[in-house]
Amino acid sequence: MPSKYERFKIETKPAPHVYQIPNKFDVSARKVRLAAMLVHEAFEYKLNKEVVLSRPCIYGVFGGRFGGFKPLKHKCVGCMRCVQEYPHIMTVKHSDSYKRLGDSFWTPEAVFTILNEASTGKIPVKGMGYKGAFGGEGFDGIWTDMSEIVRPTRDGVYGREYISTSVDVGRKPTSVDFSKIDRASSTIEIPVPIIFDKLSAGNGDVRAAVGMAAEKLGTFYVSRERTPFDFGQESLIPIGNEEGIEDLVERPPAIVEYDAEKSDLFEKLASRLPSSIVIARLPLREDSGMIACKLAHEGVHGLHLYADYHGQDYSKEPQHISASLKEVHQQLVKGGLRDQVTLIASGGITLAEHVPKAIICGADLVGIDTTVLVALQAEFRGETRDRANCQLKPRKIDPEWGAQRLVNLFGVWHDQLIEILSAMGIRDVRRLRGDIGRSMMDAELRELSFKGIAWAT
Amino acid sequence: MGNLELIVEKHSERIHHGLEVLPNLRHGLPEGLGNKRWTAELILATYEMALTGDLPKNGLEYKTGNSGGGFDVLGWKNNGSAKVESDKIDLSIELNKRDDGKKITIPLPIYGGGMSFGSISLNFMLARARAAKRLNTFMSTGEGGYPDDIVPYRDHVITQVATGMFGVREETIQYAPIVEFKYAQGAKPGLGGHLLADKVTSEVAKMRESSMFTSLYSPFPFHSVYSVEDHKKHVDWIKTVNPRALVSVKVSTPTDVDMVAIGSYHAGANIIHIDGGYGGTGAAPEIAKKNIAMPVEYAIPKVHDYLMSEGVRDEIVLIASGGIRTADDIAKAIALGADGCVVATAEAIAVGCTHCGNCERGRGCQVGITTTDPELSRFIEPEWGETRIVNLFTAWSKRLRSILAGFGLENVRDLRGRRDLLVRYK
C-alpha cells in the first residue's frame, strides 16, 4: 500500500508508429484539368500569385512543392473541401491500402483506432455524430445505460470524483471465518479489469514488451512459457501442466492457469501451490455453464473462459461471447456460486467499449489478445479467427517501445471505462458485473419499440 | 480589395458553386463522401434541397440512410394516391399544451437544436437565427452563451441553460420565449460538453468567462440537481426570472427515459426533449457516441406510451432529436409518438457540411461551420445560409405534406403515435 493516497492514473506518453501505416484517404487530381484551372485562375486574378495558389485545404494536403500535382496524402482527413471546390478535378476516397487493413472481423476503422490509441495514449475525441451501423451483433448490439442526475460527478476528464476500476482475482469465502482472519487475503487486486491473454504468436521482443507493460500497469499476462527476462516475472500467469508442476513449485506464481479441458490438475496445483490462485482455463461452449458450476463446486478459484479471436464461442452453433458469458454467469448465480469465483473472459475483446460490455455480460475482468499484436503493429496476413492459426504476424520491435504502446493502450481504455462508468453513475467497476439491467439490447428494444409495426411484404 | 479578401471570396464562391454542381452527379458520386448514417446520396440530396427548396428530381435518395436499423428499416404502408390536397394540410404544432403560460405554435414540426457559440461560427449561428425567424420557428443557443449579434432574433432564439452555465444571465433568460435545460446530450450522454482548447479564442473565452485556449469540459450533472424536486426548483427559477418563458427539458435516452419524462412533467416542464445517442456534437469521445444510451427511435415509443398510460400525454410536448436527418425521419418520429423534432446536423449539411467529423480540430471546419477561425467563418454568409436552411425546410415540408396526403391526414398532429402506418424492413 502506498504511504499516502494517490489517485490511480496510467501515465501515457507518445510512442509513434515505427512501421508506416497506410494513408486513410487517397486524394488525387486530374492533372490536365488542374493545369487548365491554374491558367484560368491566373487570368481571372491577374497573375496574383498568392490568390491563384491559395489552396482548397486547411490541412496542408496541397502545401507541398508541387501542390495538387503531388498531394501530401498523409495529411488528408477526408474533409472533401477540395472536391466541393473543384469537383471536376479532385477525387478523395478511402485508400486501397486502408481498406485492406484487418480481416473479416477487424475493420480498418478498428485497426486505426487501436494504432492511434497505442501511439498517442489519448482518448479518441471527434466532432459530429456517430457514423456507423445502427446496432449489430454481439457487443455492437448492446448500449450501456446512463443516468441524468446521479453522482459521481464529472468535472472534466480528471476532475471527477474517484471511480475505482480495481477488481479482485481469486476465490472469495462465502462467510467470514474468524479463525483465519489474520491470514493474508486469498485474492489479488488488479487496478484495471484487463489482463494480457496468451498470444497466438509472438517473438521474444513482443513477450518482453507484454511483460514490461504488465509490470508497469500492475496487471498480469498469461503465457505458456516463462520468459527469460528479468522483468515481468511477478506479473506472469503461467499455464501449468503435469510436467511443469515442479518448476512452478520452485517459483510459485501469484496466479496460475491450467487447461481444464485437457487435465484435472486443480487438486494438484492447489495442494502444491497453496499460495497461488488457481484458474481453470476453458473454451466457451454450450455446456460451459454446467462445467463452470462443477469446477466452482470443486473449489477452483476462478475460470478463464475464452472464445475464438473473433469473439465466437466453440458451440456447435457458435454464438457471440456476450451471449455465452451471460449464460455462464447466470448459471453460477443460480447455483449460488458466482461470488466465490472470478470469471475472466477473452476472445474478441478488441476495443475499449468491449471491456464494460463483457463485464455487464458477467465477466469480472477480460483478457486481450489480438489487440496486443495490433497495437504493436503486427501484420495482417489473413484471417485472425483461429487461435491455433491466427494470421497476425508480429514484427520486430523494441521492447521498451512496445511496452509504452501497451501502457498507452491501457491508459486510454482505462479512461474510456471511466467515461462509461461515470455516465452510468457507477463508482466501482465491480458493481457493473452482470448488471444487465444497466444495459440495453438492440434485439429486445427493437421488439418492444416497434411492436405492432407490420413487416413489409 | 486585399489578397485576404480575394482569397476568401475565391474559396467561398468555389464552395458555393460546388454545392450547386455536386448533386447533379455530373462528376459522379464522390467516393470519400458520407457514411452509413449520412450516405453520400443523402448529403447531396440535402445540398440539392437547400439549393432549390424542392425534393431532388434526379433520383438521389433523400428519405433514408443505410445504417441497417432504426429509421432506416422503417417505411410507410402503401397508401396509393393522395387523398387530401397538399395545401390544405396543417403542419403546425403547439409547444405549450398546459393550460397556463404563453401559447406558442410553430408552422412546422421542427426547430433548430443547440449548437454553441465556439463550437460553431457566429455566421452560421446568425444564419440559423435568421432562418428560424423567417420560418417562424426557433433555434437554440447551445451552451456557449448568447452573442449580442443574435439579440435581434431573440423572439426565435431558445436560451439553453446547461451545466457549464456559460452566458446564462438574467437578460438572456428574459429574452427567451423558451428556455431549454440541457441535462444531457445524446452524443455524449452523462459526460457534459466538450470544447477543445484550439477553438477557445478570445471571443469565445470572453463569452464563456474562461481562459483563452483552454479546453472547456462542462460538468456533469447539474450540481444543483440530484432529484426531481431539485429539478422543479430549476424550473421555478426560470419561471420567476421570466414568467412568460416555456421550459424545455433536454435529456438523453437512458433505460428509464420514461421516468425522466414523467418527472419533468411533474416538475412543470412544457417540453420534454429526448436526444438520442446518434445525435451530433462539436466534440465528443468516440466511445460515447456509439455505446451509451439508446437511439431515439427506441426511446420515442417508450416515452410516448408511458406518458399516455399516466394520462398526461396531452399536457406535455414530446420533442425528439439525435439522428433526425430527413423529412421521413421526422414523420417516422411523429408516427412513433413524438410531437415534433429538433434538427441540427441537417442544417449544417445544408450549408456544406460533409459529416467528415473534424469539427473538434484547431481551425475546425473547412467550410466555416464548426469553426472559430475568422477567415473560415466568412465562407458562411448569414443571408446565404439562411436561404439554404429555409429551402431545406421548405422541401421537407413538401415531403411531409405528401406523406400525410397519402394517408388522408389533414393535420400533422393526427400522425402522432400512428405506428400502424409504418412498416418494418428486414
How would you label these PLM feature ranges?
Chain B
Residues T159, Y217-E381:
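Glycine-rich phosphate/ribose-binding loops and adjacent secondary-structure elements
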Residues L135-M139, G164-G167, K182-G186, V204-E209, ...:
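Glycine-rich loops and low-complexity Gly/Arg-rich segments
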Residues G352-R419, V423-R424:
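Active-site or pore-adjacent capping/gating segments
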Residues E180-V228, T240, T255:
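Active-site cores of enzymes that catalyze phosphoryl transfer or operate on phosphate-rich substrates
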Residues A127-F138, H234-V241, G263-A267, K302-Y306, ...:
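Generic, well-ordered alpha-helical scaffold segments in large soluble proteins
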Residues L122, L126, V225-K232, A293-E297, ...:
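Electropositive phosphate-/nucleotide-binding environments in soluble metabolic enzymes
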Residues N78, K97-D99, L108-I110, S119, ...:
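Solvent-exposed, flexible loop/coil residues
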Residues M1-I110, G114-E203, T387, S397, ...:
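Conserved, well-structured core domains of diverse proteins
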